[in-house]
């Protein structure tokens, strides 16, 4: 496809850093997730963070519901090397402790963090340690006076909540922050981000909150996040799923991959199958995806069950397979190879060939 069709003009935004991860001002869109372990279970939380790192997470958020969790956060921070965000609600003092214990960023909720004095104290501590903050507005926890004014969560309500706290930050000359205005309703979230994006230059953390289980949540999040990204809105993302956090990261990268905003791992092109398929495409793709989850190098691999589209797709993929009777045609860099692969050996042989190609690409980069 003509690359001109893939250009997304991103919204101009300021640059902040969460740890060493740049956010905003055309930095690569970062993928976040959140642990769902008990923070006080230090070993379990660390293990989940390591799992998230294996699938490419850039930033991890951890809930700090009480002082004991804050103390656990301190130990977790010592034993991990990915930027950690302390998620704070209700008790502003926990934000102060999290900063003290090494948080790379704070998330505070305007709907429950308290009055201006409390926010000012958090900002003072964050300034001293050069720690950024996310103003995380959520449709499900708006301030009482705002909810009374608008009756129900609306884009105006979410944006007013965000702007109120942005004014606090501006008054204290604190500009190291990003903002989110999340809702579980896709239309509400999208319109809220559109409105906010026109008012401020700070980076925007985007997502559809509480989007549901793995299937429904993936669909809902993909639609909401992708629509915003296509409009150039969004500097960092989280796919919120009622599923294992690693699934959030995988879906996040898939969204960015589809939009050519960021690539990680293998992009499988696979047919939906019909009676023309010469081998079990569904099982083949599922097994290859599972076996090759560790791959981070971006390449396109086409697995098509017959020659109708198999040849054409293989010619534009890094590696391709066009199904044929008993043996299938194999392509590399668009060129058909002399070797054919027995259909019963496709999973094994293709995994070997993909890994070999990845090694070749990585070695070529090193030599250059």
Swiss-Prot record:
Any single GO molecular-function term of the entry would be:
iron ion binding
Q: Which reaction does it catalyse?
A: (2E)-4-hydroxy-3-methylbut-2-enyl diphosphate + oxidized [flavodoxin] + H2O + 2 H(+) = 2-C-methyl-D-erythritol 2,4-cyclic diphosphate + reduced [flavodoxin]
Question: What are the protein's UniProt keywords?
Answer: 4Fe-4S, Iron, Iron-sulfur, Isoprene biosynthesis, Metal-binding, Oxidoreductase
Cofactor binding description: Binds 1 [4Fe-4S] cluster.
Please tell me where [4Fe-4S] cluster binds in this chain: 271, 274, 306, 313
Pathway in which this enzyme or protein is active: Isoprenoid biosynthesis; isopentenyl diphosphate biosynthesis via DXP pathway; isopentenyl diphosphate from 1-deoxy-D-xylulose 5-phosphate: step 5/6
Does the record carry Lipid biosynthesis as a key word?
Answer: no
- Names of required cofactors: [4Fe-4S] cluster
Point out the coiled-coil segments of this chain: none
**Function description:** Converts 2C-methyl-D-erythritol 2,4-cyclodiphosphate (ME-2,4cPP) into 1-hydroxy-2-methyl-2-(E)-butenyl 4-diphosphate.
Q: Record's family?
A: Belongs to the IspG family.
What name does the UniProt record give this protein?
Answer: 4-hydroxy-3-methylbut-2-en-1-yl diphosphate synthase (flavodoxin)
Specify the species. Answer: Buchnera aphidicola subsp. Acyrthosiphon pisum (strain APS) (Acyrthosiphon pisum symbiotic bacterium)
Q: Which classification does the entry list for the species?
A: Bacteria, Pseudomonadati, Pseudomonadota, Gammaproteobacteria, Enterobacterales
């Amino acid at each position: 496809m003509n690359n001109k069709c893939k250009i997304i003009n991103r919204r101009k935004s300021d640059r902040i850093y969460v740890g060493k991860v740049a956010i905003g001002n055309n930095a690569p869109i970062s993928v976040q997730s959140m642990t769902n372990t008990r923070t006080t279970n230090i070993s379990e939380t660390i293990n989940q963070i390591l799992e998230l790192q294996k699938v490419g997470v850039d930033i991890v958020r951890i809930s700090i519901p009480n002082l004991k969790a804050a103390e656990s956060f301190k130990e977790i921070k010592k034993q991990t090397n990915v930027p950690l965000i302390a998620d704070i609600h209700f008790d502003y003092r926990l934000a102060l402790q999290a900063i003290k214990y090494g948080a790379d960023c704070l998330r505070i909720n305007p709907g429950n963090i308290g009055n201006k004095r409390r926010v000012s104290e958090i900002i003072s501590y964050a300034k001293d340690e050069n720690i950024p903050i996310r103003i995380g507005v959520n449709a499900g926890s708006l301030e009482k006076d705002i909810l009374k004014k608008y009756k129900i969560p609306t884009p105006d309500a979410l944006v007013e909540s965000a702007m109120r706290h942005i004014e606090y930050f501006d008054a204290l000359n604190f500009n190291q922050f990003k903002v989110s205005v999340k809702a579980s309703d896709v239309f509400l979230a999208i319109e809220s981000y559109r409105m906010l994006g026109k008012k401020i230059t700070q980076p925007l953390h985007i997502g559809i909150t509480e989007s549901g289980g793995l299937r429904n949540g993936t669909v809902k999040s993909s639609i909401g996040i992708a629509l915003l990204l296509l409009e150039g809105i969004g500097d960092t993302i989280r796919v919120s799923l009622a599923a294992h956090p690693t699934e959030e990261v995988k879906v996040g990268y898939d969204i960015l991959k589809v939009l050519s905003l960021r690539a990680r791992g293998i992009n499988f092109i696979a047919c939906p199958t019909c009676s023309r398929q010469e081998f079990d495409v569904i099982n083949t793709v599922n097994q290859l995806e599972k076996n090759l989850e560790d791959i981070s190098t971006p390449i396109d691999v086409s697995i098509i069950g017959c020659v109708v589209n198999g040849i054409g797709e293989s010619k534009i993929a890094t590696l391709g397979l066009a199904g044929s009777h008993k043996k299938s045609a194999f392509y590399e860099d668009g060129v058909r190879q002399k070797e054919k692969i027995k259909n019963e050996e496709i999973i094994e042989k293709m995994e070997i060939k993909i890994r070999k190609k990845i090694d070749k690409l990585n070695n070529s980069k090193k030599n250059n």
